[in-house]
């Protein structure tokens, strides 16, 4: 396909046009008085949302060159989303401000490479300052405030996430599901839960609720299919003597063996239940090993030279209680903290080493199941459109609270970046010179952009608000919801330091890339061929 090649100023201006379009569409959502954006969907109802990165992903322009600008700034938003899970709109507004200021300097003859160096050095300095400013949080109240701000000032959501964090701890997983009612509810599971239920309903001990509840059971873990009941007989005999229940977790149990277990269960010879192992392939094995660590048992696998027919009682795991229904199994075990801690550290190391987001997610899930539990927030809303918007806000709120627990909090509402402008100017004047200093000044001039936009969305004059904030103490900022200047930390208007840091780093990175662009190679727009002329009369007895 033929390409269009554009150089110098013309290339940068085309990118700028695309960046302007995207930044304006996203910036309208910023702050407590930010508006919503409606996304038209080819199929289904339109979506009304307030989430920067989701809007950015939807924007495609007709002009290929302008679309390249959109894609670049979209990257700033999605990288921030990947790192911190929130702050995507702030990253977009910052990147836009840096690009606008930088392009003016490049047009005036500044060297783009030196400007980029200055931008990078300024960004590194600011990151270290944000780390210094960050206050660690531990109390539930501060966590709730963080969630409230990220969810668009919804206090109920903030409190719910703080409760969930309290119950499942730092390593726990908080997942979102679409609820069945109008209200949003929180459901917390203690212990390890996985999505496999009993193989046969005959294992249920409570026929009304169709649940199998085993107290203080032995747990047999194996990664192979159990085909013959003879393999199980030695273990079953040993357990029958103890009078305790048994849970079997295996890849599968064939009909003959299953029938024998069911008959024993119904006759009251042995209280037994069988469940298929969760996951597939290597992941299944890893999850079974996690269960073995949790229940203080051994995974009976041929890789370790162990066979079912010579399994001993001491190889089996134990738990305080196991609850099984048709879809899920929950194991509540205790008293094996040291081994579980070691296993958790091992999983954390694997998480640090992997680059795949999917693998990281799965490892995080395993970690949560081992370390303390899973909380499920069931999102309730009147309509599907509202449900989708609520779900995105909740996702941001969960990510923001996790980021806050990780790296601490800073004053919110664009306040931190605005105050840091003076520190950056002082540092740049004494450490940088020439065009690198101009690069740092570009960053310094852009730092107030998020605050100005928050103020403008609330109907105030952005430039005036920014100047007023700069003249006040470092934790003071502008509360756009009320129009007052207040101590942001005391009022609970806070941002996670990680969100502020990621947004700034990604914005600086994209701005540097755009400024150093000297040529764009893009596809030529395809010429639409005229439709062929209609055929003549078809003849015959019919009118066509």
From Swiss-Prot:
Keyword Nucleotide-binding attributed: yes
Pfam families given in the database record: Cpn60_TCP1 (PF00118)
Main localisation: cytoplasm
PROSITE patterns listed in its UniProt record: CHAPERONINS_CPN60
Catalysis performed (reactions): ATP + H2O + a folded polypeptide = ADP + phosphate + an unfolded polypeptide
Keywords from the named record: ATP-binding, Chaperone, Cytoplasm, Isomerase, Nucleotide-binding
InterPro entries, alphabetized: Chaperonin_Cpn60_CS, Cpn60/GroEL, Cpn60/GroEL/TCP-1, GroEL-like_apical_dom_sf, GROEL-like_equatorial_sf, TCP-1-like_intermed_sf
Origin: domain of life: Bacteria
Name recorded for this polypeptide: Chaperonin GroEL 1
Organism (species): Prochlorococcus marinus (strain MIT 9303)
